[in-house]
Regions:
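N-terminal cap/lid segment of alpha/beta-hydrolase-fold proteins
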Residues: 31-64
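Accessory cap/linker subdomain of secreted extracellular hydrolases
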Residues: 37, 171-311
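Alpha/beta-hydrolase active-site loop
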Residues: 114-133
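Primarily recognizes the serine-hydrolase "nucleophile elbow" in alpha/beta-hydrolase
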Residues: 138-191
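Conserved alpha/beta-hydrolase "acid-adjacent" motif
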Residues: 328-333
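Histidine-bearing beta->alpha loop at or near hydrolase active sites
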Residues: 350-363
């Protein structure tokens, strides 16, 4: 039975340029000692927290450790993540720990679309773990939302330490594609609902994705049902509530990338808008004629392309799990990565599966655990999982 989308959480979400790839790998520093390290032993196992490379980290080793490791990447965070040593491991990491794997995770030294920081900082943490706790028998990589993109990055740039990876609701594929789509949709919203949201280029530096912002958008949508319907059709979102959330969230994401790139990295001048109506092309024509067009700043565009344009060369098996409807990481944005993997000749290392549920990362513990088990069997030389619906 399909369930409705649950409340959205704050944690959501390079062509791999060889120079940057090598720099990111070598930036990892296993020789550094962590700061503020604390260790707690309990009947469940050992937990260590601290600061490494300016990023908070957490290590969990179960009492009945199988001497294998899961390197975990969290998703897009609007606010800094932190770890509390006395808190029990939960969420997306729990199925791995329950299967007797050690789990390590970095909070990253920056919030937002922190691929530039997350990848080397997590690799540094992996090396620290190996140095302190010993070489694991096997190592897997997993992550949710933006963390799913980091799983793909890891298996493209540095597959050697890993046997396989699990991408949970991951925003995989070229950043310019998924974020450029969000930018274009925000521009379309401004045409239908002018002066509701702050300027798009540049987004004010102090903009925050708040409940008040979402309520403001929702009020505007409900005041003009015909334009709201055009926007829902255009974006593929099911409800005004989903659309209101995304308009505010997309604005924050655009601001994040403008800050990181040192200017606006998005360009909708050549974007052709389609899909506002299933019965007529007139509204598409009107939107394309009247929507405001923006040009990208070259240096900002270059940053967007570096972080990250995949090469598709998955060096290890990767299983991707998604809900059938995800208003944050939309399914129709994921096909391009599959095409890139096929073009790279790595299609045998990539499988996508879905569950019959709505919402972003809205999986049960059993579903995540079953998907992980499938991936491990596959990585051990077993049958390649069947694409489509996850079988339990």
């Amino acid at each position: 039975v399909r369930r409705p989308a649950f409340a959205f959480s704050a944690a959501v979400f390079f062509s791999a340029i060889p120079l940057l790839s090598a720099r990111a790998i070598h930036a990892a520093s296993p020789g550094k000692k962590p700061a503020q390290a604390q260790v707690l032993n309990s009947p469940a196992g050992l937990t260590e927290v601290g600061i490494l490379d300016a990023a908070a980290y957490r290590i969990d080793v179960p009492a009945n450790w199988n001497h294998s490791l899961v390197v975990f990447y969290h998703g897009y965070a609007l606010r800094p993540a932190s770890f509390h040593i006395a808190e029990r491991l939960s969420g997306q990491q729990q199925p791995f720990f329950e299967r007797h794997y050690a789990v390590i995770q970095s909070a990253y030294s920056q919030t937002g679309w922190a691929l530039q920081q997350a990848y080397p900082e997590t690799e540094s943490l992996r090396r620290y773990f190996v140095k302190k706790y010993g070489q694991p028998r096997e190592t897997f990589v997993a992550g949710g939302s933006m963390g799913g993109q980091l799983v793909a990055i890891t298996l493209e740039l540095n597959p050697k330490p890993y046997l396989g990876g699990l991408d949970l609701c991951g925003s995989v594929g070229p950043t310019y594609e998924s974020f450029g789509h969000r930018f274009a949709m925000r521009a379309a919203f401004d045409y239908y609902f002018p002066d509701v949201m702050p300027p798009l280029v540049p987004v004010p530096a102090d903009f925050e994705d708040t409940i008040a912002d979402r309520d403001k958008v929702l009020t505007a949508l409900r005041s003009n049902p015909s334009s709201a319907a055009l926007m829902r059709n255009l974006t593929g979102l099911h409800t005004d509530l989903d659309l209101a959330h995304d308009i505010a969230y997309w604005t924050f994401v655009v601001a994040d990338m403008q800050r990181r790139g040192g200017g606006n990295p998005f360009d909708n001048r050549n974007y052709i808008y389609t899909g506002t109506s299933s019965t007529s092309s007139a509204s598409d024509l009107e939107l394309n004629d009247k929507v405001k067009r923006y040009a990208a700043v070259p240096q900002a565009r270059a940053y967007l392309m570096r972080h990250y344009t995949p090469n598709g060369h998955l060096g290890r098996p990767m299983l991707a799990l998604h809900t059938i409807y995800d208003p944050i990481v939309q399914i129709n944005q994921l096909a391009l990565y599959d095409h890139e993997v096929q073009a790279a000749g790595a299609e045998e290392n990539f499988v996508q599966q879905i569950v019959d549920r709505e919402g972003h990362c809205n999986f049960t513990q059993n579903e995540m655990g079953d998907a992980f088990d499938e991936m491990v069997r596959w990585a051990h030389g077993g049958k390649r999982p069947t694409p489509g619906v996850l079988k339990q």
